[in-house]
């Protein structure tokens, strides 16, 4: 009997989930959710992931291989929605929301953390800082432990510098 149910279930095509959702400030997902929007970074698809704030147990990581030892400026894409969310801010009785997000840079056996208030930064590339990075794997981590209502994880870039 369970075999018949399994065969019947296989006849029905499962609905394909959409890869990208719309950002809905009145409903924040509890898990990382992909969004596509004009304020996100992308060459083909402007996309990012977002979720509601949490305890820090959920994180996203960006991994890259640094080709040679040297100084690198590490930047993140600030998908800024403050102006777009003004109507929500007015309804909540505030005009600005602090968006502190802490990025952790791991390389070799080193770990450094940098906290940015992304509401104070412009939309686009924002520097986390300049770091001397050895050749090899570098990991940037962003957790869901933030001061605002939500966290957005978009793009990270590494630019070789003189110092």
Task: Annotate each language-model stretch with its function.
Residues 1-163:
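Extracytoplasmic
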């Amino acid at each position: 009997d369970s075999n018949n149910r399994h065969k019947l279930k296989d006849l029905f095509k499962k609905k394909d989930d959409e890869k990208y959702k719309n950002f809905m400030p009145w409903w924040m997902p509890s898990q990382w959710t992909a969004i596509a929007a004009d304020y996100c970074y992308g060459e083909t698809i402007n996309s990012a992931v977002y979720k509601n704030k949490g305890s820090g147990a959920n994180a996203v990581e960006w991994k890259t291989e640094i080709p040679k030892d040297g100084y690198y400026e590490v930047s993140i894409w600030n998908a800024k929605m403050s102006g777009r969310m003004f109507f929500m801010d007015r309804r909540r009785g505030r005009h600005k929301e602090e968006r502190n997000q802490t990025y952790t840079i791991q390389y070799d056996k080193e770990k450094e953390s940098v906290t940015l208030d992304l509401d104070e930064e412009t939309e686009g590339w924002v520097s986390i800082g300049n770091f001397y990075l050895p050749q090899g794997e570098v990991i940037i981590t962003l957790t869901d432990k933030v001061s605002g209502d939500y966290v957005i994880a978009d793009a990270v870039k590494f630019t070789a510098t003189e110092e």
